[in-house]
Amino acid sequence: MPSSAHLQDPPPLLSRTLTQNEGQTSLRQSSSCGPSAASASESLSGSTESRIPHSKMLQGKLPRNIPLEYPAGLYCCYVVIIVLSVAVVALSVALSVKKTAQISTINTYAACPRNWIGVGNKCFYFNEIPSNWTLSQTLCKEQGAELARFDTEEELNFLRRYKGSSGYWFGLHRESSAHPWKWTDNTEYNNSVSIGGDEKHGFLSDNGFSSGRGYIVRKSICRKPNSYTSQCL
């Protein structure tokens, strides 16, 4: 009779066969669990993504070269800066023009000698010493001037306004009532203002421009170019 030990122990070949069968069974069970594990992983991933804010997900998908929207306040700042810059430039230009005009005015009127009055680019002097027409012209020449003439309406209005109630000799003369009026430089008068009377020498009176006898003594008006204007020309 064989011993009980020999009956309990399986043969070595049978033992190896059982071990291999157990391993294959274990592998099949592991494979069958594969889809379930994958589903669980995907479910976990989905739940994680659902917790991520939608705006961040979209921001991550945008290309980096596309800028985000600027706030409206930033554009307002740009507009304010541009407007202020334009205003500063305009103010600077206006101040520069005003300063230039002031300098021009100072140069026009300040270059006349003392007691002379500047009008445009001319200087006028009201001589209060009565003299005849010829002596009055001589006194004006001694100061580098001539008996006054008017070339513009501005000068004419000035003479009328400033002379007061006295009569003043000015630079018109003629040979006779049949001849044209001429200035002291012998240029012909254009008769822009009529001169009353039949005498040979012109003077400015309360009634306007009149003619008188040259030997009568009157005050006189001298005129010469503005010295600054003469230098610039």
Swiss-Prot record:
Glycosylation sites: 132
All ranges on the Cytoplasmic side of the membrane: 1-76
Subcellular location: Cell membrane
Extracellular side: 98-233
Bias-annotated ranges (Polar residues): 16-29
Sequence intervals crossing the membrane: 77-97
Biased composition range(s): Low complexity: 30-50
Topology relative to the membrane: Single-pass type II membrane protein
Primary location group: membrane
One GO term (biological process): negative regulation of osteoclast differentiation
A GO-annotated cellular component: cell surface
Domain C-type lectin: 119-228
Entry keyword set: Cell membrane, Glycoprotein, Lectin, Membrane, Receptor, Signal-anchor, Transmembrane, Transmembrane helix
One Pfam family hit: Lectin_C
CDD domains listed in its UniProt record: CLECT_NK_receptors_like
Region (Disordered): 1-52
GO molecular function: carbohydrate binding; natural killer cell lectin-like receptor binding
Summary of the function given for this chain in its UniProt record: Lectin-type cell surface receptor.
Protein name: C-type lectin domain family 2 member D5
Organism per entry: Rattus norvegicus (Rat)
Species classification: Eukaryota, Metazoa, Chordata, Craniata, Vertebrata
Gene behind the chain: Ocil
